[in-house]
Design a protein with these regions (language model features):
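Catalytic cores of carbohydrate-active enzymes across secretory and cytosolic contexts
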Residues: 1-476
């Protein structure tokens, strides 16, 4: 059994993917093989976890009994088991049909079910117990995201010696939305169990501070509030990407060659317009398809000079809103191709698939215009990845004002995705921008991201948490 880690990450999912081929870097555990998943969070936390012999607690992604704890590249992994029922109620239900839509501005109506809440609580309790078991005395525990909002308080109850951080990867809603949540006081008290609660944007932190005062009468000053005789800090830490990794990939001759090949396969159009998202109703996929269709109908764009590639990664496929979205998106793609495609040249290439990092990098390199048009998004890493991949190539980013990334990527072609004419206008400006201007915009955004990468994000959060820990100790 894993014991006594000075640094523990608790997240819904483990940072590894199960491998089915013969990848040499994979590790075995109970007959199953794993490798680190390519996400930015893993890359950011890997050095900290490796240096401190850290532990990551999370679910393997499939229902049923969990494999035994194992190690991948110096990180101890403690898999959590979720039964079929728990996947349905805690993951698909309370996390992704109640909290996800509510925190994303109610863009789809959240569904409230009592039995989902009960299971959410039970599963959160199990994650907290697992963290309490592996954390060394005085350890730092960093809890991630909306699936585990009750964990900080549950953990503190069992282990008051721990320094507890929480980071919310999605937006934190304004008071009037949060107040709809039947479990609202419990969720808020859950988060207040942390010493530091991190948000993507300042607005999220402010919403949280105001909500605590409104719901629990907790006084605050600046970013610090007082709760049950403790200080809790709420601040913004905008997450970022592994900029160097994406730049390296985009510089790789094989990736460049693949980008050329992609353009050739698309019929060497003048303009390749790209969208890359999980197939999620928060991402504004339909809105951007509609803007493209209207520009084709207006004659401002035409096939085969302009083509669109929409990658829509399968996601949460058993949740009703996601099934409905898939039908709507696929109908719209069919309509556009029916009206504007030519034999052998569809107007929209729609790919409901997952890709490797290098294939994604090749797509970014191949695209003249990247469309990121969420109705609401905590950050949106795809926008940042596209910028990182465009080293010398210019290219233009159309970006929704409602993505957290819009707070940093000010040289993008910003738009309001609800305003169709505005989206069309931003897309046309991106398509027609001259090369010098495109390069100028891209290089300003790159300069920003080179400095504000995911490693900077993790160390800012952890330094801030350590400072709180230091202050606490000084007070005692
Ligand atoms: P979200 O976290 O809501 O899915 P983000 O844009 O912040 O949205 O992050 C998505 C991450 O998933 C990015 O790192 C992106 O590269 C990756 N990704 C998106 N689509 C695919 C895909 N089809 N295959 C593999 N990775 C993908
Ligand atoms: C968002 C959430 C993450 C989640 C990811 C993929 O980024 O903030 O917590 O892991 O989407 O969603 P999934 O439901 O497949 O884990």
């Amino acid at each position: 059994m894993v014991q006594g880690s000075p640094f523990v990450v608790v997240a819904n999912r483990l940072p590894v993917d199960e491998v089915t081929d013969d990848t040499p870097s994979s590790r075995t555990s109970g007959g199953r093989r794993w490798r680190p998943s390519p996400g930015g969070l893993v890359t950011a936390l890997h050095p900290v976890l490796a240096e401190h012999k850290g532990t990551w607690i999370g679910w393997s992604g499939t229902p049923g009994p969990a494999p035994d704890p194992f190690e991948v590249d110096g990180i101890k992994l403690v898999p959590m088991s979720l039964s079929e029922d728990e996947v349905e109620r805690y993951y698909e239900g309370q996390s992704n049909a109640t909290i996800w839509p509510l925190y994303h501005d109610n863009v789809e109506p959240p569904i409230f079910r009592r039995r989902w809440r009960d299971t959410y609580r039970e599963v959160n309790r199990r994650y907290a117990a697992a963290a309490a078991k592996v954390a060394a005395p005085g350890a730092t525990v960093w809890v991630q995201d909306y699936q585990l909002q009750l964990v900080p308080a549950m953990l503190r109850e069992q282990r008051p010696d721990l320094l507890i951080g929480f980071f919310l990867h999605i937006p934190f809603p304004p008071i009037e939305l949060f107040m709809q949540l039947p479990q609202r006081a419990e969720v808020l008290r859950g988060l207040l169990g942390a010493d530091l609660v991190g948000f993507q944007q300042r607005l999220g932190a402010q919403n949280f501070l105001r909500l605590s005062k409104h719901l629990l009468g907790t006084p605050y000053s600046g970013s610090t509030l007082e709760y049950e005789g403790r200080k809790v800090k709420a601040e913004a830490f905008p997450i970022s990407i592994d900029f160097a990794e994406m730049q390296r990939l985009a510089d790789n001759p094989l990736v460049r060659e693949r980008a050329k090949q992609i353009r050739a396969e698309l019929g060497d159009p003048k303009t390749v317009i790209l969208g890359v998202d999980r197939l999620d109703y928060t991402k504004g996929i339909e809105h951007r398809l509609k803007a493209f269709r209207e520009l084709l109908a207006d004659g401002k764009l035409s096939v085969p000079e302009s083509v669109m590639v929409q990658v829509a990664t399968p996601s949460r496929e058993r949740v009703e809103h996601y099934q409905a979205l898939r039908v709507k998106v696929e109908r719209e793609v069919g309509r556009i191709n029916g009206d504007f495609g030519k034999v052998g040249v569809p107007a929209v290439h729609y790919l409901h698939q997952s890709y490797s990092r290098s294939e994604l990098a090749a797509l970014y390199c191949a695209a003249d215009v990247m469309m990121v048009t969420p109705l609401r998004d905590g950050m949106n890493l795809v926008a940042k990845e596209y910028v990182a991949a465009r080293a010398e190539n210019g290219g233009a980013l159309v970006l929704s004002e409602f993505a957290g990334a819009a707070g940093e990527l000010r040289q993008a072609f910003l738009c309001n995705p609800h305003d169709l004419d505005g989206v069309k206008d931003a897309l046309m400006r991106a398509v027609t921008v001259d090369e010098g201007e495109a390069r100028r915009r891209m290089s300003i955004m790159q300069r920003h991201l080179r400095k504000h990468d995911v490693a900077a994000w993790a160390s800012e959060f952890l330094d801030s948490l350590a400072e709180i820990g230091g202050t606490e100790k000084n007070r005692l």
